[in-house]
Swiss-Prot record:
Highest taxon above the source species: Eukaryota
Record's subcellular location: Cytoplasm
Keyword annotations: Alkaloid metabolism, Cytoplasm, Methyltransferase, S-adenosyl-L-methionine, Transferase
PROSITE patterns: SAM_OMT_II
Binding residues annotated for S-adenosyl-L-methionine, in chain numbering: I198, G199, G200, G201, D222, L223, D242, M243, K256
Catalytic activity: 16-hydroxytabersonine + S-adenosyl-L-methionine = 16-methoxytabersonine + S-adenosyl-L-homocysteine + H(+)
Protein name according to UniProt: Tabersonine 16-O-methyltransferase
Tissue: Expressed in leaves and flowers. Detected in stems and roots. In leaves, expressed in epidermal cells.
Annotated family: Belongs to the class I-like SAM-binding methyltransferase superfamily. Cation-independent O-methyltransferase family. COMT subfamily.
EC number assigned by the record: 2.1.1.94
Induction data: Up-regulated by herbivory.
Organism from which the protein derives: Catharanthus roseus (Madagascar periwinkle)
Length: 355
């Protein structure tokens, strides 16, 4: 290849950009841990570099203060803050962008947990073990297990910081989904008398649905240690159990970000359990998950979906699925039909499945 050609320069640019992409993620995580988005927001107007540095709590060490500019420059160049240099001023002014606003602690739908989880050293070690996982013949079913000697859930149960990052991410996501469901997708719950939210955790989504549909009995179905200390109130009940064995009967079963954690064989088992739990007439399963390539023209979306698919492989030996793969699962589990509502949010779709 001619080293002076545009083709070579373009190839160089792509390799350098991708090889350095982790630096952006690490810098964003650093900004979140230092409280930079919240500090800018608390200032109430564009903030100078020195004002920002002096306002950080806990403070940065005085010897490191001169280097905050380097971090802010990376954030600004990647759209996580705006940087403005006014005429006659020696310092730039920084403001939040839409991307950094959804990292604020006060924002109910914040994505802080996603940033902290994806850039967690625990996760990075799993990715570092991916090539070993491909090459080895040990009994580890995931790259995460190759790295840590335990599966994702087992490790999280023993390491609270990792679990807290993940739980924060899931709680914020449930807030987002709740808002979408009781808004644009409210029609899904009309006419239902009962619903079971599988893996519903502390019941964020079930409570939101129950509040807007008082006649609807909502059951949060999760593992015993998850629901052990949760109190059932009004039309929200917490029930312990195993979705592979038996699911409580209801008009509808709700699965948010559950099936992408499991391989095809296990997904069919889960779906068969769901089918047994709903009536043959009028029953349905509501799934929130990715449908890969739902919009092939959106390159940013496709790249994010394929990255998430790799994350499912690394952590769970599972996957994201295209419509054809979803249809296969539904048929294998004995369902007659389904309907996809694309683009529930940036990456996911909503699927109704009928017995």
């Amino acid at each position: 290849m001619d080293v002076q050609s545009e083709e070579f320069r373009g190839a160089q640019a792509q390799i350098w950009s991708q090889s350095c992409s982790f630096i952006t993620s690490a810098s964003l995580k650093c900004a979140v841990k230092l409280g930079i988005p919240d500090t800018i927001d608390n200032h109430g107007k564009p903030i100078t570099l020195s004002e920002l540095t002096n306002a950080l709590v806990p403070p940065v060490h005085p010897s490191k203060a001169p280097f905050i500019y380097r971090l802010m420059r990376v954030l600004a160049k990647n759209g996580f803050c705006s940087e403005e240099q006014l005429d006659g001023e020696t310092e730039p002014l920084y403001s939040l962008t839409p991307s950094s606003r959804i990292l604020l602690k006060k924002e109910p739908l914040n994505l802080r947990g996603i940033v902290l989880t994806m850039a967690d050293p625990v996760q990075l070690k799993a990715w570092e073990s991916l090539s070993d996982w491909y090459q080895n013949e040990d009994d580890s079913s995931t790259a995460f297990e190759t790295a840590h000697g335990k599966n994702f859930w087992g490790y999280s149960s023993e390491h609270m910081e990792h679990a807290e990052f993940f739980n924060e991410a899931m709680a914020s996501d449930s807030q987002l989904i709740s808002k979408l469901l009781i808004g644009e997708y409210k029609f899904l719950f009309e006419g239902l008398a009962s619903l079971v939210d599988i893996g519903g955790g502390t019941g964020t989504i079930a409570k939101a649905i129950a509040k807007n549909f008082p006649q609807l009995k909502c059951t949060v179905f999760d593992l015993p240690h998850v629901v052990a200390n949760l109190e059932s109130k009004e039309n929200v009940e917490f029930v312990a159990g195993d979705m592979f064995e038996k699911i409580p009967s209801a008009n509808a079963i709700f699965l948010k970000w559950i099936l992408h954690d499991w391989n095809d064989e296990d997904c069919v088992k889960i779906l068969k359990s769901c089918k047994k739990a709903i009536p043959a007439k009028g029953g349905k399963v509501i799934i929130i998950d990715m449908v890969m390539y739902s919009d092939k023209k959106d390159d940013h979306l496709v790249k994010t979906q394929t990255s998430m698919d790799m994350a499912m492989l690394v952590n769970f030996a599972a996957k994201e699925r295209c419509e054809k793969e979803w249809a296969f699962l539904f048929k294998e589990a004995g369902f007659s039909d389904y309907k996809i509502y694309p683009k529930l949010d940036f990456t996911r779709s909503l699927i109704e499945v009928y017995p």
